Swiss-Prot record:
Catalytic activity: AMP + ATP = 2 ADP
A biological-process GO annotation: AMP salvage
Domain of life, per lineage: Bacteria
Pathway(s) annotated for this protein in UniProt: Purine metabolism; AMP biosynthesis via salvage pathway; AMP from ADP: step 1/1
Binding residues annotated for AMP, in chain numbering: T31, R36, K57, L58, V59, G85, F86, P87, R88, Q92, R156, R167
Keyword Cytoplasm: yes
SUPFAM superfamilies attached to this UniProt entry: P-loop containing nucleoside triphosphate hydrolases
Compartments, record wording: Cytoplasm
Gene this chain is encoded by: adk
The name this protein goes by in its record: Adenylate kinase
């Protein structure tokens, strides 16, 4: 199966990506990881990407599409793949289609903004170990202290409410239009499923909803 996962930052895409990659034995293809790997391996696409990044510019869609095409041609993508963080915009989705990359299902994890702010603003992290907590859903035994070490927990800058709201604004401007784009594509194309799941449900309920919709 070839998937695209859509949803705002904090909607739970990471959790569902882990589930889907395991369930279908497919790799999760993150554009960030691909870029880093291509630059490290000094592939032609990687060298081009590095030039843009060194100049402080965004890497072009053409380069990202080239990286995606190279990556999905690798043997571990024989059963399919899950695209993570791409496409982010309608022009990128058009470019992906024009490049002949076929997708079986687009899964949208739908969570209201207010819930996302609540989820992310409640996160606390133990910097040394990476252990994460949530003041409502997974609180530490002692407020603001790590369970194992008793060290202070911190709130990451990008989990602060005002930062989360800024990220949601960018998501609604750039990425949310993909929802309409892929819904329209699925109506025209019997091979493409568009699945919208209520991401406020418990994790295992979200997983079951996705699997039943894929049948």
């Amino acid at each position: 199966m070839k998937f695209i996962l859509l949803g705002a930052p904090g909607a739970g895409k990471g959790t569902q990506a882990q589930f889907l990659t395991k369930e279908f034995n497919i790799p999760q293809i993150s554009t960030g990881d691909m870029l880093r790997a291509a630059i490290k391996a000094q592939t032609p696409m990687g060298k081009m990407a590095k030039e843009f990044m060194d100049a402080g510019k965004l890497v072009t869609d053409e380069i990202i599409i080239g990286l995606v095409k190279d990556r999905i041609a690798e043997p571990d993508c024989a059963n399919g793949f899950l695209l993570d963080g791409f496409p982010r915009t309608v022009p990128q989705a058009d470019a992906l289609k024009a490049a002949g990359v076929e997708i079986d299902a687009v899964i949208e994890i739908d969570v209201p903004d207010s819930e996302i702010v609540n989820r992310m603003a409640g996160r606390r992290v133990h910097p040394a170990s990476g252990r994460t907590y949530h003041i409502t859903y997974n609180p530490p035994k002692v407020d603001d202290k790590d369970n194992e070490t008793g060290d202070d927990l911190i709130q990451r800058e990008d989990d602060k409410a005002e930062v989360v709201l800024d990220r949601l604004k960018v998501y609604h401007e750039q990425t949310a239009p993909l929802i309409g784009y892929y819904k329209a594509e699925a109506e025209k194309n019997d091979q493409l499923k568009y699945i919208q799941v209520d991401g406020t449900q418990p994790i295992d309920t979200v997983e079951k909803s996705i699997l039943s919709a894929l049948k």
